[in-house]
Amino acid sequence: LMEMHFQDEPVDFILDCLHYWVTEYHIDGIHLFAGEAALNAAARDALLAKTKLITVFWNGEKKHYKNMANYNAGFMNVARKFLKGDENQLGDFVNVSRYNPVQSANINYITSHDGFTLFDLVSYDRKHNEANGEGNADGENFNNSWNCGTEGPSKKKKIQHLRLRQMKNALMLVLLSQGTPLLLAGDECCNSQAGNNNPYCVDSELSWVSWNSRGMAAEMTAFAKELIAFRKQYKILHMPKQLLSYDSLSCGYPDISCHGSSAWYNTMESYNRHIGMMYYGRD
């Protein structure tokens, strides 16, 4: 995916830029920041019909284009809070995990290029952007991260195991939710940026993706592959429209149901931090 930002440029100029990158560099998709007129024109453009277009739907607006998807930061924020055990998150997580509008695709992610990597999300409580030369003033301050007990790298086995478990949990939140999952390159092999959540100006090992294949990274990569295969295997995990919480598929049970400590009793109290979600359908 190529990320492109436009402000007041004419629509024709924007389309010419998109056409050039698609025809000359054969990119698969575009993360597009532009005005309403340009977004509508790009979604209707014949040359871009098979190009994945991702944007942010502001002010609750809904775009009904099959090739244009919503970059859903709402899922990220809720999933991060739920992952680290914040209170009063169950209801919000159930809502974002089942959200799957039929009119357009919905992109779910827990990390992106604009923020912490997954490894850093479970290794740092705060950003460490000193290398950017701006006195650590740049980058997002509210990351909803948790360092699992120690800030930064740790040789303690208990912390390493907890971080690995949390990273696996994070991948499951993304890949077992409805909608379209998006993974940040390198998250599957524990890539770290040493707590820097905005390394756009750093051209060094800090910002390069490290394709590690040893130890924890090898286990994480194998887990990611198995989880992706599991999602592909079961249609109920990637339905074309939102599940309705009743037997909409005529299978004998609700298509999605929530459970607490006892089956069929979902306890959404603010102090509860666990929930069971059952998908039920046919292949």
PLM ranges: what are they?
Residues 1-12, 26-35, 79-82, 149-163, ...:
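The substrate-binding groove and active-site-proximal loops of carbohydrate-active enzymes
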Residues 1-25, 35-47, 51-52:
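Substrate-binding/active-site clefts of carbohydrate-active enzymes
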Residues 10, 14-21, 163-174, 178, ...:
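Alpha-helical packing segments of well-folded alpha/beta enzyme cores
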Residues 26, 39-185, 198-202, 241-242, ...:
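Conserved alpha/beta catalytic core and glycan-binding cleft of carbohydrate-active enzymes
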Residues 184-189, 193:
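Short acidic/histidine-rich active-site segments
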Residues 193-225, 229:
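Extended hydrophobic/aromatic segments used for targeting, binding, or gating
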Residues 215-254:
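Catalytic cores of secreted or luminal carbohydrate-active enzymes
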